[in-house]
Amino acid sequence: MHNQYGSIFSITTWGESHGPAIGVVIDGCPAGLSLSPEDFLPAMARRRPGQLHTSPRQEPDLVTILSGVYQNKTTGTPISLLIENKDVSSSSYEQLQHCYRPGHAQFAYEGKYGFADNRGGGRASARETASRVAAGVIAKKILLSQRIETLAFLSGFGTLESKNYPKLSDSLIQQVHTSPFYTLLPQEEIQNLLLLNPDDSFGGVVSFITSPLPIGLGEPVFGKLPALLAAAMMSIPAAKGFEIGAGFSSSQMTGSAYLDAFIADESGVSLQSNRCGGALGGISIGQPLEGRVAFKPTSSIKKPCSSVLKDGTLIAYRTPNQGRHDPCVAIRAVAVVEAMLDLTLVDLLLQHRCTQL
C-alpha cells in the first residue's frame, strides 16, 4: 500500500479507524522549527468529529509528539506523531461483516487483498486524515516562516455554490475559521438544507487560495505544481474532482476570453487576471494559487438502498441507526484540503532550493 506522500518533505500515515491509535511520521523537516503539542489544537479542532453537523463520534484528537522534537524545537530527525482513538464503537459494524456497504471501499479492499477491516472503514476511513492535518500543522509553520499563507474554505454545499476566489487576508481567515461550516456561503441556507433532508447527505466543494507564491515552485512535465496538487487532493477520501484556476469552465471559453494578459509596474511583471490559477507550464509564477476540490455525498445515509451479501444474495440495505456519519464530508474536509495544500507546497519549496547553486 502507498502510505507515503512527498519527496523531500514527506509523510507516512498509519493506523485504522477503530484501532487503538493513528499517526504520522514526518521526514525532511528542517531543524530549529518551534513546535509544541498546543500548536496542533486549532487545526485538529477544525477537522475533528463531534461538532455541529458532523459525525457525532467524540474524538479529542490530541496530538502526542513521540520523536523529532526537543525542548519545543524540531531536531531535523523524523517527527513521529500519535493520535489516540478514544471513541471507538465497532458493534454497529458486526452485522455488516457478511454484506457489502454501498459506496464504501470494503468491496475493493477484499478484491485486492482478500481481506478487509470493515470496522468504520478501516484504513479507508476519513479518520486517517487526522494524521494529515497534524502533519499539515508543521508544513504551515514552515510556509509562514517564508511569508506564504494558505486557506481552504467550503465554497459549495449541495446546490449552493460560489466560484469566486477572494483575496487572502487576515479578516478572511478569521471569517472562515469562525464559521461553523468554514464557509463564506449563507449559513442559514445550509442549515435549511440539512433540516429538510435529515435522512440524506450532501456533496460539497472546497476551495483553496494562497498569498502570492514565489516564482519557481513545481517541476517540468511530471512534477508540475497542478499535477502534484491534483494527486494530493484526489487522495482525500470522497474527493471526486479537482480544478485549478478557471478549471473546467475554461473548456467553454475562447482563447481571447481565457488568456491572462501580462502587465508590469514598479513591483515587476504580473498578470491582469488569474484564470491559470497561479501556474504556467506547471510552475508557480508569483501569483496566488487558486483551486477547488469536489466531494461526493456521504455514502452512509438513513435511506434504504439495494446491496448484496457476500454469497451474492440481493438484500435491502440500510445504514445501522447507531452508525456515526457526516451529513456532508466536505465540511471537515476543509482542514484536510488545507493540510494537503501546505504539505505539497513545502515539499516543492524545498525541492526548488535544490535547482540553483
Curated annotation (Swiss-Prot):
InterPro entries: Chorismate_synth, Chorismate_synth_AroC_sf, Chorismate_synthase_CS
Residue ranges of the TM segments: none
Name listed for the protein in its UniProt record: Chorismate synthase
Pfam families, per the entry: Chorismate_synt (PF01264)
UniProt keyword list: Amino-acid biosynthesis, Aromatic amino acid biosynthesis, FAD, Flavoprotein, FMN, Lyase, NADP
Organism: Chlamydia trachomatis serovar D (strain ATCC VR-885 / DSM 19411 / UW-3/Cx)
Subunit organization: Homotetramer.
Role description: This reaction introduces a second double bond into the aromatic ring system.
GO cellular component: cytosol
Binding site for FMN: 123-125, 281, 296-300, 324
Pathway this chain belongs to: Metabolic intermediate biosynthesis; chorismate biosynthesis; chorismate from D-erythrose 4-phosphate and phosphoenolpyruvate: step 7/7
